[in-house]
Amino acid sequence: MNQPPNRDRRSQKYLGSKGLILLIALLSAFVPLSTDLYLPALPGMGDYFGVSANLTNLTLILFFLFFSLGLLFWGPLSDKYGRRPVLLAGLALYIAASAGCALSWEIWHLIAFRVLQAVGGSAASAVATAMVKDVYDGRRRESVLALVQSMVVISPAVAPVLGAFMLPYTSWRGLFVALALIGTVSMAGGLLLEETIPSRYTGTMKQSVRRLGTVLRNPGFTSLLIVFSLVSTASLAFVSASPYIYQEGFGLSEQWYSLYFALNAAALIAGPFLYLWLSRHFSRRMIVGSGFAVMIASGALVCLFGSLGPLLFALALFPASLMGSAVRPPGAFLMLDQQKEDTGSASALINCSSLVFGSAGMILIYLGGESLVLGLGAINVAVGVVCLAGWTVIGRRGLTKI
């Protein structure tokens, strides 16, 4: 596979440059949109089906698991057959599965359709990150990644609020209808998309999948992959536990929960912009290292003061959310920069690893005892310590240019 150097030169006849960025941002947001929109309804769904919270949470956990596995399938496939056909096939499955979720009459039917929804939606994320590498170079790529990330994290802020305010007028089924409509809008954008891949992999499909191993054998890529994927352990632990912390722990309504959730999500929105501003004055190495240190301090504050009330909890977690989001653009840039070829495979591994570590966080948060607040604080401290240590080792050993 021989890809020429990327240039910011791949015009889109129908979408245009701004339309392409908007489409990439929407595709990248499929994970938070597919999970956060129905978070306010999660406790009520357990009551509707007459099942425990653990079983209801399988609709989240298995979604992340199969989303991550789907990435490993769609990523190499897009290197061989192109981004556009893979995107359209995945979106068709996502739309059909979303409709199936809305029509589910038993919890196991819902879980099955969520698995199919995850597999279809994973094509969107795999293709989105790869298209950034296809089209943009250097500083422009880093800026686009930051812009896309900032737009992506708007969805965790908007989705729970939208979901909470939809619930008085519809049931949880209506939220999955909304996801089907989002998939339809994305499909329209995909139909207008012109192929972005510079050159396609010419080997067999089996050889294409094996390129995942080739990418993982790059020590610079793999070391960065582990460090930056760990951040998702803390962020998705919060996503999983937040409705139970705010609604059952602090006794808030669905609407108040969505507003407090949006406060933390505002930090996610600001993070990439903060990084772009800081990158004009400080080195990437210093910004990322400081971000991990802030996560440690913020996690400690959550442990000390988070149980005293919803506002103190949200404010204590705010710095961790802010800096966890701020380190995402440089992390994605550095990981993509390690691979001159196999962009689809690298993109798949980046997103897959993030979701695998995130799914682990969604499980760990319920294994730490009765206090979800203390558990979340401890996870942030642990993640910050490990990431800071790993980042320091990467810098000292010169595994990659940071």
Please identify what each model-predicted range represents.
Residues P5-Y14, T196-L224:
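Juxtamembrane intracellular "pre-TM" segments in multi-pass secondary transporters
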Residues G50, G82, L103-H109, G120, ...:
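Helix-breaking motifs and short loop linkers at transmembrane-helix boundaries and internal kinks
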Residues L69-W108:
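Conserved MFS/SLC helix-loop-helix module at the cytosolic interface between two early adjacent transmembrane helices
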Residues L93-G100, W108-L116, L311-P319:
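Paired small-residue
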Residues H109, G138, A146-L191:
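Helix-loop-helix hairpin linking two adjacent transmembrane segments in secondary transporters
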Residues F113-I154:
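Cytoplasmic helix-loop-helix junction between adjacent transmembrane helices
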Residues M286-P330:
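C-terminal transmembrane helical hairpin of 12-TM major facilitator-type secondary transporters
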Residues L336-E370, N380:
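A late C-terminal transmembrane helix in Major Facilitator Superfamily
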